[in-house]
Amino acid sequence: KYATKYPKVWKIKKLQLFILHVHAPCVRILTKMCYCYYAQIGGKYMDKKAKIITVAGKGGVGKTSISASIVRLLVERYPDKKILAIDADPAVGLSVALGVDVKLTLDDIRMGIVDSVENGETKEALELLSEARFRIFDALVEMPGFAFLAIGRPESSGCYCKVNSYLKEVIGLLANSFDYVVIDGEAGIEQIQRRVMEKVTHLLLVTDQSKKGAQVVSTIKNVADELIAYDRIGVIVNRVTYPELADLITVPGVEILSFIPADSAFAANDIKGKSVLELPADSAVLTGVKDALQKIEIL
């Protein structure tokens, strides 16, 4: 699967598979070789900067639907580009919205490492981390036009900072193998910064038409200013039921990119259990998200 669409990533994967079957004392040397090989075969491929689009907002405003719509529009506009969808919400709603069957999450991999350590297994830490790095490729679900990665539920009690930091670094390396990365986050931005990555190119904040929703988005923006680095930011107002009152929605210091009316086609699609990929092309959600992406120079 990877050999055709991700030939350079596949070479790395084969090298890591080789590492896993080597005696532990050799792992450090071979891992360093892997890093060198990573840089060598990457060249221009790894130097390019992926466009990383993070979607955040108050719960219940259609954030996941917006994220799924972004993935669909990117796939349709850029069929020759590599697109990665990351579900950073423990509810794993993005997988449902995109029709993805998730078998393995990043947290499953993390807990596997933690369990090995707590059970007293003799594998060295570096060997365990190398194995985790390999298994992330197993967690990738390949869909028509895009790949999908689920982060999973939040960490359990206890501190495994080195493991979490390592996995976040691997996500960053993986993201740079793609042209576009769409991250569907939790209601806040803190979990994305702690569990996924600290720098994105585009931050899209989603709210409904309520005053409370706008206040939550404003708070998320202020927190994001301190926690993560981003190049562009904008707000999408979703499920607008009173368009004549649209001017009352303001978020200080942030441009409102699009007002999306309540979409009966989307509601019917959701009731039938269909994914966003099956929405009519002229649906209000897709039209509104497309307008927002054009304003923020993604499309």
Where in this protein do the model-derived segments appear?
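Phosphate-binding P-loop
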Residues: 46-50
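Walker A/P-loop phosphate-binding motif and the immediately C-terminal alpha-helix
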Residues: 51-90
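P-loop/Walker-type NTP enzyme "switch/lid" segment
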Residues: 90-172, 271
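C-terminal boundary of histidine-terminating zinc-finger modules
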Residues: 272-282
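Short hydrophobic alpha-helical segments enriched in small aliphatic residues
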Residues: 3, 22-27, 39
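Cationic, low-complexity basic patches in intrinsically disordered or flexible, solvent-exposed regions
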Residues: 2, 6, 15-17
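Conserved catalytic-core segment of NTP-binding enzymes
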Residues: 162-262, 268
